[in-house]
UniProtKB/Swiss-Prot annotation:
Signal sequence residues: 1-47
Designated name of the protein: Uncharacterized protein YncM
Keywords, comma-separated and alphabetical: Secreted, Signal
Predominant subcellular localization, coarse grouping: secreted
CDD domains associated with the record: YncM_like
Organism classification: Bacteria, Bacillati, Bacillota, Bacilli, Bacillales
Organism this protein belongs to: Bacillus subtilis (strain 168)
InterPro entries listed in its UniProt record: YrpD, YrpD-like_sf
The keyword Nucleotide-binding belongs to this UniProt entry's keyword annotation: no
UniProt similarity note: To B.subtilis YrpD.
Top-level taxonomic group: Bacteria
Compartments reported by the entry: Secreted
Name of the coding gene: yncM
Annotated Gene Ontology cellular component terms: extracellular region
Length: 250
């Protein structure tokens, strides 16, 4: 797993993380511009036992639907006692075309908040439609809070994420971001992950991260979907109905 980009406190490369998260976490290959996140699906078999460029847990959602929703319960506390890894909590999908999307949240140790992140294939330049000033820079979603996530694979040719929750100032509202011009067609499967990602595989042994999160009431196209456990790499993944808890500990 690679280390996705950073926003606000962690330097936001706007090259956000879809690929980063996905790249580092799921596969051994890094996406362009985003350290630590998986990029393509070529090394899926390897990822099933270990997440290259990081550690964590992953589940797949066997649905080809277009709209993903879930309530994410953020960790009350995050122990990230190293200088090389970044915690991520995210969802996303793999298209039949091979495009991998990583969409969710990245932890800022500097501000103790969770910030939005997106990457779809080679595209990682986000467009903010609403809420940028409330959930980026030195602001983000408050630890221990619940965030309502909605992902649209293709909305007028763009991939969009909406996150609704409470920031570190106590403001409750939403942020809407999208990657434009993705033109996603058929989906192969969806996914959810919690990872601690690094930029290089050689940094894996130095990771010291402990946190736990849940994706509750997971639906795709308004239908409940039961997660299928794929990877537990220094992580415990527990599924109950259309809910999953991922606890990372190293």
């Amino acid at each position: 797993m690679a280390k996705p980009l950073s926003k606000g406190g962690i330097l936001v490369k706007k090259v956000l993380i879809a690929g980063a998260v996905g790249t580092a976490v799921l596969f051994g290959t890094l996406s362009s511009g985003i350290p630590g996140l998986p990029a393509a699906d070529a090394q899926v078999a390897k990822a099933a036992s270990e997440l290259p460029n990081g550690i964590g847990g992953r589940v797949y959602l066997n649905s080809t639907g277009a709209v993903f929703t879930a309530k994410i319960v953020l960790p009350e506390t995050v122990k990230n006692n190293d200088s090389v890894s970044t915690p991520y909590i995210y969802s996303g999908f793999r298209a039949t075309s091979g495009t991998e999307a990583d969409i969710g949240l990245q932890y800022s140790k500097q501000y103790n908040v969770w910030k939005p992140l997106m990457k779809v294939g080679s595209k990682n330049e986000e467009t903010y439609i609403e809420g940028k000033d409330k959930f980026t820079y030195n602001k983000g979603f408050r630890p221990g809070s619940t965030v309502q996530m909605t992902i649209y694979k293709n909305l007028s040719g763009n991939t969009r994420m909406t996150l609704w929750g409470t920031n570190n100032d106590g403001y409750t509202g939403r942020i809407i971001t999208e990657i434009q011009g993705t033109n996603i067609g058929t989906i192969s499967k969806w996914k959810t992950l919690a990872t601690a990602a690094v930029s290089y595989e050689s940094q894996r042994d130095a990771i010291k991260a402990t946190f736990s999160t849940s994706f509750n009431n997971i639906t795709i196209d308004n239908k409940a979907v039961t997660p299928v456990v794929d990877t537990q790499d220094f992580a415990k993944v527990s599924v109950a109905g259309n809910n999953v808890t991922i606890s990372v500990n190293k």
